[in-house]
């Protein structure tokens, strides 16, 4: 059952955390830009450019985009929006059938790397309130080369372990459940293949203890901040071939297909009057369909 006490305070607390996490991630990614070896990554280290936007129906957000030498394209976005769901949206949102007003705040990130040896990554966490409230989010890794897309590859093992630690700190049953949900969610039925090697995915997370649920969502964000830079540092010094770059560009096509056909966040943003530039910034900067 949703704890509705001091809902305004909870909204502000969640929003402040997502903005703080954004700042931490952007700072770490800029450090990685500085550390990238110059013999593999020419040019000046990239820096994030922030662009605020307003939603006509209520709220807005800030896009943080970087086109760097290591990070070919990365967006780390925060948004806080509120208003009234359309009847179609209200039918699918817990608590909105009683009252269609809503509030949503969160962070969303997608990184496409220049090196095909460094996996792409997606992470988002969010807090949504109607007459009920809940958290959702997760993180998933998308290696672009076939040999890295195996569950026994070291990067996959370490990525899953990071999220297992985050889950186990709160409930030892959560990781298996949210890992399976991630595998089910990030799957392309028309290709009959997963988008990547998975991670965790959760939604409508409401135990009735807001502080506990918020702490878990914070730990999901911290787990990402711990593991992904570790994997980038592990792989960014490896050289790559033209054939591997080609494989990367083709595999990126799967990313585009998933985000435009199936992704809940994309659909939610477009159907609630979100910022189109921000929503579609998840698209890779270069992609091929052979």
UniProtKB/Swiss-Prot annotation:
GO CC terms of this entry: cytoplasm
Natural source organism: Caulobacter sp. (strain K31)
Lineage: superkingdom: Bacteria
Matching InterPro entries: Coprogen_oxidase_aer, Coprogen_oxidase_aer_sf, Coprogen_oxidase_CS
Binding-site positions, a divalent metal cation: 112, 122, 160, 190
Pathway info: Porphyrin-containing compound metabolism; protoporphyrin-IX biosynthesis; protoporphyrinogen-IX from coproporphyrinogen-III (O2 route): step 1/1
Job description of the protein: Involved in the heme biosynthesis. Catalyzes the aerobic oxidative decarboxylation of propionate groups of rings A and B of coproporphyrinogen-III to yield the vinyl groups in protoporphyrinogen-IX.
Protein name as it appears in the record: Oxygen-dependent coproporphyrinogen-III oxidase
Subunit record text: Homodimer.
EC number: 1.3.3.3
Region annotation (Important for dimerization) ranges: 255-290
The protein's required cofactors: a divalent metal cation
Localization: Cytoplasm
Transmembrane portions of the chain: none
UniProt keyword list: Cytoplasm, Heme biosynthesis, Metal-binding, Oxidoreductase, Porphyrin biosynthesis
């Amino acid at each position: 059952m949703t704890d509705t006490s001091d809902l305004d305070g909870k909204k502000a607390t969640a929003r402040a955390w997502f903005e703080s996490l954004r700042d931490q991630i952007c700072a770490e990614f800029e450090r990685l830009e500085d550390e990238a070896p110059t013999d593999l990554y020419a040019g000046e280290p990239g820096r994030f450019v922030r662009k605020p936007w307003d939603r006509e129906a209520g709220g807005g957000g800030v896009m943080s985009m970087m086109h760097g030498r290591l990070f070919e394209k990365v967006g780390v976005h925060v948004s806080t929006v509120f208003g009234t769901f359309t009847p179609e949206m209200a039918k699918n949102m817990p608590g909105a059938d009683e009252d269609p007003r809503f509030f949503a705040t969160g962070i969303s990130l997608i990184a496409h790397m220049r090196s095909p040896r460094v996996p792409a990554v997606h992470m988002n966490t969010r807090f949504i309130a109607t007459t009920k409230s809940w958290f959702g989010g997760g993180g998933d890794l998308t290696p672009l080369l076939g040999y890295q897309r195996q569950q026994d590859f070291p990067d996959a093992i370490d990525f899953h372990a990071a999220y297992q630690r985050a889950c186990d700190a709160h409930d030892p049953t959560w990781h298996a459940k949210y890992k399976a949900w991630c595998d089910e969610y990030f799957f392309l039925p028309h290709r009959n293949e997963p988008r990547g090697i998975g991670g965790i995915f959760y939604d409508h997370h409401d135990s009735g203890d807001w502080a506990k649920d918020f702490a878990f969502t914070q730990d999901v964000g911290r787990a990402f901040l711990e593991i992904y830079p570790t994997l980038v540092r592990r792989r960014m010094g490896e050289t790559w071939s033209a054939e591997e770059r080609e494989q990367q560009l083709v595999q990126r096509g799967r990313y585009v297909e998933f985000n435009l056909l199936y992704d809940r966040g994309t659909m939610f943003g477009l159907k609630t009057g979100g910022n189109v530039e921000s929503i579609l910034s998840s698209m890779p900067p270069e992609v091929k369909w052979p």
